[in-house]
From Swiss-Prot:
<comment type="pathway">
    <text>Amino-acid biosynthesis; glycine biosynthesis; glycine from L-serine: step 1/1.</text>
</comment>
<keyword id="KW-0554">One-carbon metabolism</keyword>
<feature type="binding site">
    <location>
        <position position="117"/>
    </location>
    <ligand>
        <name>(6S)-5,6,7,8-tetrahydrofolate</name>
    </ligand>
</feature>
<keyword id="KW-0808">Transferase</keyword>
<dbReference type="GO" id="GO:0035999">
    <property type="term" value="P:tetrahydrofolate interconversion"/>
</dbReference>
<dbReference type="GO" id="GO:0030170">
    <property type="term" value="F:pyridoxal phosphate binding"/>
</dbReference>
<comment type="similarity">
    <text>Belongs to the SHMT family.</text>
</comment>
<keyword id="KW-0963">Cytoplasm</keyword>
<comment type="function">
    <text>Catalyzes the reversible interconversion of serine and glycine with tetrahydrofolate (THF) serving as the one-carbon carrier. This reaction serves as the major source of one-carbon groups required for the biosynthesis of purines, thymidylate, methionine, and other important biomolecules. Also exhibits THF-independent aldolase activity toward beta-hydroxyamino acids, producing glycine and aldehydes, via a retro-aldol mechanism.</text>
</comment>
<dbReference type="InterPro" id="IPR019798">
    <property type="entry name" value="Ser_HO-MeTrfase_PLP_BS"/>
</dbReference>
<dbReference type="InterPro" id="IPR015422">
    <property type="entry name" value="PyrdxlP-dep_Trfase_small"/>
</dbReference>
<protein>
    <recommendedName>
        <fullName>Serine hydroxymethyltransferase</fullName>
        <ecNumber>2.1.2.1</ecNumber>
    </recommendedName>
</protein>
<dbReference type="InterPro" id="IPR015421">
    <property type="entry name" value="PyrdxlP-dep_Trfase_major"/>
</dbReference>
<keyword id="KW-0028">Amino-acid biosynthesis</keyword>
<dbReference type="InterPro" id="IPR001085">
    <property type="entry name" value="Ser_HO-MeTrfase"/>
</dbReference>
<feature type="modified residue" description="N6-(pyridoxal phosphate)lysine">
    <location>
        <position position="226"/>
    </location>
</feature>
<dbReference type="GO" id="GO:0005829">
    <property type="term" value="C:cytosol"/>
</dbReference>
Amino acid sequence: MSILSTLDPEVADAIRLEADRQEYNLELIASENFVSTAVLEAQGSVLTNKYAEGYPGKRYYGGCHNVDIVEALAIERAKQLFDAEHANVQPHSGSQANMAVYFSALKPGDTILGMNLSHGGHLTHGSPVNFSGRFFNVVPYGVSPETQTIDYAEVERLALEHKPKMIVVGASAYPRTIDFAAFRAIADKVGALVMVDMAHIAGLVAAGLHPSPIPHAEFVTTTTHKTLRGPRGGMILCQERFAKSINSQIFPGIQGGPLMHVIAAKAVAFKEALQPEFKQYQQQVVNNARTLAEELVKRGFKLTSGGTDNHLMLLDFSGTEITGKAAEEALDKAGITANKNTVPFETRSPFVTSGIRIGTPAATTHGLKEAEMVLVAGFIADAVANIGSDETLAAIKLQVNQLMKKFPLYAKG
């Protein structure tokens, strides 16, 4: 950091403070993780200087032979990791991956079925404030009031009634296993395409700990961070017959030059995910989530659907005076980073909410295991019980910091 500190001390100080936050705070945001030093090195490489519009072997710029090697590696590793016929590793984000699929397979005004955002879906699955809700006729499906799990009977009823061109599967706050085969069967009854957004569970899928959507969907999109533990970015996997249309929608359709330094980091992350250690890591993520959920229930917390099958859980404060916003702020003062989240059948504003979303991927990367999850549940319970007591929250933060010092993230140079 010496060169940066000299040239731009303001930015250098902000980076240093963020590094300390990641080291000593407890990161429980379900969509966040920590990349390896190898991924950091690739993303901070000289590849950031290279424009490479087009695809390997078919570029619009010269001097692309080295970045062609990198992108080809990323593509082949992605295909191997998920047993996919085709991979496009150029999307800058999961949202742009979803946009490319929509624009390649749909026309404006076409009907899509997507999971209700307040029930655990995602903005790009048809929210009216998002492009997906403006370009297409969206019919939302959700969870059962009784079980708070996806109501497949409702999905089938809506599909038969509205005859969607595409059914969008996937979520950003759904703690249970998704039955991709059931969605495929429903789609086949109405001749619909299936797009699965597996952004949150991609790492679990790669490790064989969640059923793969690949056999059941024409299109699968994902981010490359979250459980996959790569750089922030997106990717599309699809059947070979859609490869040309997907590629042309990414470039020149919605993007220009790909971010080759990020694609290099994706390639490195995919190689890491192909190692046996990655499956062990993902198993620990699931074990930690299960333990944390059980411990929170013991302490009187209500969890959406009663628990978790994957890496995340949703604390539900509906019916109480506690809001997600207040709980998030209290946890932050206690050195615990989480995010407020709507719960199914939400009655509060999305800026206030009745829930908190918690995930274990980042904490597991730090090295925390089941024993630490018991402590974490205690920290969360104490923080939520002491909303408004800054002195108590500061004391909890000291305990959190002491715990995290035992599990260093990056070796200090």
